[in-house]
Swiss-Prot record:
Source species of the chain: Shewanella sediminis (strain HAW-EB3)
Protein name as annotated: Phosphoenolpyruvate carboxylase
InterPro entries referenced in this protein's UniProt entry, alphabetically: PEP_COase, PEP_COase_bac/pln-type, PEP_COase_Lys_AS, PEPCASE_His_AS, Pyrv/PenolPyrv_kinase-like_dom
GO MF annotation terms: magnesium ion binding; phosphoenolpyruvate carboxylase activity
Pfam families: PEPcase
Cell membrane in keyword set: no
GO cellular component: cytosol
Classification via SUPFAM superfamilies: Phosphoenolpyruvate/pyruvate domain
EC number: 4.1.1.31
Gene that encodes the chain: ppc
GO BP term, pick one: oxaloacetate metabolic process
Catalyses which reaction(s): oxaloacetate + phosphate = phosphoenolpyruvate + hydrogencarbonate
Residues at the catalytic site: 138, 545
Organismal lineage: Bacteria, Pseudomonadati, Pseudomonadota, Gammaproteobacteria, Alteromonadales
Keywords (A to Z) from UniProt: Carbon dioxide fixation, Lyase, Magnesium
Length: 878
């Protein structure tokens, strides 16, 4: 195993050694020796050496206050460097075949063309793919942007050091730069001093595009074009854009009072500003490239027979882009722009049409080779990013919209909308939607909360359609939730039909999703508004928190099947929007497998998926990584469309239904019905302390006074991953599998795992979570932190965990977890000796801070760093 990952281990060793030297330089030999001793004891403890565990605990609990922060920092930064080495390994020249699977698009094209699908159908599918990746802020994206940039530079150096042509002197220079970077990382505070604002989060999303995706999109499309040309002899269109990007950063106001209409306007301006600035950089380079004279008649006529026709057109574009950047700079700085507004880029066509004219001229003049360089890259960036860079979604809770109408109906003396039944609401909304008179009086002065919702709708009305994506209604459950938003958009003067998307989140709402959409499709006015296209969002986080992962997964699958069927009957094209998180408890996991495990017919060339916080960095943070991720998404959506999985057999459905029912009962018997559960959760995890971390712009709770129901899905999962019990990602599932086994259904479960991608993916995700769970560490937290009268609950939870692991091992016919995915197992094994000491210290620090009236600054900072370190080691936070 060690040989298989030799280059990975070598890089981990190099980075760890340099970190050690940095620590020695800044502290002393004795401290470094203590760190190394703890690391070795953690390794031995992992192999079952009880004496080593006791010795390690003795050292950790004896750490003086002044050593707590450097200790936590050392292990945290080692885990971050291990992540970097692993991330780099997947794109490294030395990557072994178990990690670097063959190119997924290449493989798929071969399979499709050797099946009975003809070439034209395949090309048509590829050219019409509509994959929309929606970047969302992540309240538990621990790493600061400053450090993320330094980590990216470390990867650049690891890549440079792989170059066999480097001279000894060049190698020395790279090693020196590596030492400098790791020293900078060591001396940088890894914990933010204050929460990021929604604008900070939006800027973080834009920086991912600038440093990675801006390059990755044309690189990926060039690679895709080569693969298609090799197989079919055909070229892809210049404006192909199988993958596009949207964002929630600065648009998602659900439970976030800091996302106001003013903030959304600033983010829209920033999106456009970043796009203009990056296009300007490209055009400046292109002016130098296109020094050629020969041109077709169209271009010569356009430039009055100029001697440098290409440059003349590009210089004009360059000036317009400069004016656009200046105009947006002035807006962002709060000045009135003193610029001729006719001389800036307002529409995508202002940028695209002149460039297309140059492209036609070059190809007509026998210079296709030149046309297919930077010029084609820019055209493909325009097809992907437009002039707004990201299409901004707006998201708000259904209740907030109802409150607007209710306040309005009370003001108008029509009664209280919130007290009407559903049929009364629909009748009123449709009457107003089809009527001509305005509903909102000019002298109406709404309350602050209502005014904010109305201001957001008024802002939408002023924006170009292409600057915006969907209006997502969270906690949607009935047709009136959708019609209410449509009425607000109409009343505020929205000139374009914005997509209004219900988000079905709880178990009940998922089960009722198809009947809600059936009712909407039955309304003629609504059918006319949608023009035969409907988007529906499936919520993963809240349904899993509500019902547990197994029952939620089946409800999501079943809801999608029913939505596909009602859309087919209504002759409506359905796009499903998957609100997945980074963790298993929030629908996370490998995107490729997740897409292929969707119900047959539910993808059909179109999909929207959220990409969150730290997962954006892991998948798209480097151009090469981003190209891999784009290829995975493209191949998965094509495969799900052209080669969909088989329909599940009736006996599989019946078994899955029973598993879902038993798992939700097992899950809720603890989370809802166990009277001591909330007290245990708050004591055994750092849930309360997490609220003090300056992580995201959004509050951790929907309501300050609420229990588990009011807690957002992300901190709920984050807290359990810190004490390593990982409870939300498995509770209920293992018990249901064991019950099925006890009924004699193990052979059926094994058949399902073998032949049904949906079930196989569920079991694979469960196996990964079980491998990351550490019952002994969770028990240590309990010993340190939980009142003795609640220990019985911890014992019961750990017994359930053991039951689940046993059931999964029997199902997969394995002796050890992740036996069939050695790369994932290696990844977990590599980190454990560094995470364990952080966990032990975290439990100790939690006990200290809870006993003391006021914890010392050292203790508080060290606690925050242990939280960051465990998150880095677990490779998923919430």
């Amino acid at each position: 195993m060690a040989d298989m990952y030799a280059s990975l281990r070598s890089n981990v060793g190099t980075l760890g050694q340099i970190l050690g030297e940095t620590i020695r330089t800044n502290l002393d030999d004795a401290f470094l020796e203590k760190i190394e001793q703890i690391r070795q004891l953690a390794k031995s403890s992992r192999q079952g050496d009880e004496a080593a565990r006791d010795e390690m605990l003795k050292l950790l609990t004896a750490l003086p206050d002044n050593e707590l922060v450097p200790f936590a920092k050392a292990f945290n930064q080692f885990l971050n460097l291990a992540n970097i080495a692993e991330q780099f390994h997947t794109i490294s020249r030395n990557c072994d075949e178990l990690v670097c699977v063959p190119d997924p698009v290449e493989q798929l094209l071969g399979r499709v063309l050797s099946s009975n699908i003809d070439q034209e159908k395949m090309l048509d599918c590829l050219e019409n793919l509509d994959i929309d990746l929606v970047l969302t802020a992540h309240p538990t994206e621990i790493s600061r942007r400053t450090l993320i940039q330094k980590y990216a530079s470390v990867i650049d150096i690891l890549a440079a050091l792989e170059n066999p042509q480097l001279t000894e002197r060049e190698k020395k220079q790279q090693h020196l730069r590596l030492r400098q970077l790791i020293a900078q990382i060591w001396h940088t505070n890894e914990i933010r001093n204050e929460r990021p604002t929604p604008v900070d989060e939006a800027r973080w999303g834009l920086s991912t595009i600038e440093v990675s995706l801006w390059q990755a999109i044309p690189d990926f499309l060039r690679q895709l074009n080569e693969q298609v040309e090799e197989r079919t002899g055909k070229q892809l269109p210049t404006d192909i854009a199988p993958v596009r990007f949207s964002s929630w950063m600065g648009g998602d106001r659900d439970g976030n009072p800091f996302v106001t209409a003013k903030v959304t306007q600033e983010v829209l301006d920033r999106n456009r500003h970043t796009a203009a600035r990056l296009y300007l950089k490209d055009i400046v380079v292109l002016v130098n490239d296109l020094s050629v004279e020969e041109a077709n008649a169209e271009l010569l006529e356009y430039t009055n027979n100029s001697l440098e026709p290409y440059r003349d057109v590009l210089k004009d574009l360059r000036q317009k882009l400069r004016n656009t950047v200046d105009y947006l700079n002035a807006r962002l700085e709060g000045h009135s722009p003193e610029i001729d507004l006719s001389s800036i880029i307002w529409h995508e066509s202002d940028l695209k049409e002149p460039l297309l004219m140059l492209y036609r001229s070059l190809t007509d003049s026998g210079m296709s080779l030149i046309a297919h360089g930077l010029l084609l890259d820019i055209l493909r960036r325009i097809a992907c990013f437009g002039i707004h860079m990201l299409r901004l979604d707006i998201r708000q809770d259904a209740e907030r919209h109802s409150d607007v109408i209710a306040e309005l109906t009370r003001y108008l003396g029509m009664g209280d909308y919130n007290h009407w039944d559903e049929s009364e609401k629909q009748a009123f909304l449709l009457r107003e939607l089809t009527g001509k008179r305005p509903l909102i009086p000019s002298n109406w002065q709404p309350s602050d909360d209502v005014a904010e919702v109305v201001s957001t709708c008024r802002l939408i009305a002023t924006q170009p359609a292409r600057a915006l994506g969907s209006y997502v209604i969270s906690m949607a459950s009935k047709p009136s939730d959708v019609l209410t938003v449509l009425l607000l958009l109409k009343e505020t003067g929205c000139p374009h039909p914005m997509r209004v998307v219900p988000l079905f989140e709880t178990l009940d709402d998922l089960n009722n999703a198809s009947s809600c959409m059936t009712a909407l499709f039955a309304i003629d006015w609504y059918r006319g508004y949608t023009k035969g296209h409907q988007e529906v969002m499936i919520g993963y986080s809240d349904s899993a928190k509500d019902a547990g992962v197994m029952a939620a997964a089946w409800a999501q699958y079943h809801a999608q099947e029913e939505l596909v069927e009602v859309s087919r009957q209504a002759e409506v094209k359905l796009t499903l929007f998957h609100g997945r998180g980074g963790t298993i408890g929030r629908g996370g996991g490998p995107a490729h497998e997740a897409i292929l495990s969707q119900p047959p017919g539910s993808v059909d060339g179109r999909i929207r998926v959220t990409e969150q916080g730290e997962m954006i960095r892991f998948k798209f943070g480097l151009p090469k990584l981003a190209v891999q991720s784009l290829a995975l998404y493209t191949s998965a959506v094509m495969e799900a469309t052209l080669l969909p999985p088989p329909e599940p057999k009736p006996e599989w459905r019946a078994c899955m239904q029973k598993l879902a029912e038993e798992s939700v009962d097992a899950y809720r018997s603890i989370v809802r019905d166990e009277p001591d559960f909330v007290a245990y959760f708050r004591a055994a995890t750092p849930e309360v302390e997490l609220g003090k971390l300056p992580l995201g712009s959004r509050p951790a709770k929907r309501r300050v006074d609420g229990g588990i129901e009011s807690l957002r899905a992300i901190p709920w999962i984050f807290a359990w991953s810190q004490n390593r019990l990982m409870l939300p990602a498995w509770l209920g599932a293992g018990e249901a599998l064991q019950a099925a086994s006890d009924r004699g259904e193990m052979a059926l479960l094994q058949e399902m795992e073998q032949d049904w991608p949906f079930f196989k993916t569920r079991i694979s995700m469960l196996e990964m979570v079980y491998a990351k769970a550490e019952p002994n560490l969770a028990k240590y937290y309990e010993t340190c932190l939980v009142p003795e009268n609640l220990h019985h609950l911890g014992e019961a939870l750990r017994t359930r965990l053991a039951t689940g692991i046993k059931a999964v091992l029997e199902l997969t016919q394995s002796n050890a977890l992740m036996e069939h995915t050695p790369w994932n197992r290696e990844s977990v094994t590599l980190r454990n000796p560094y995470i364990d000491p952080l966990n032990f210290v975290q439990a100790e620090l939690l006990a200290r801070t809870r006993k003391e009236e006021e914890a010392s600054t050292n203790v508080e900072l060290a606690l925050m760093i242990t939280i960051a370190g465990v998150a880095a080691g677990m490779r998923n936070t919430g």
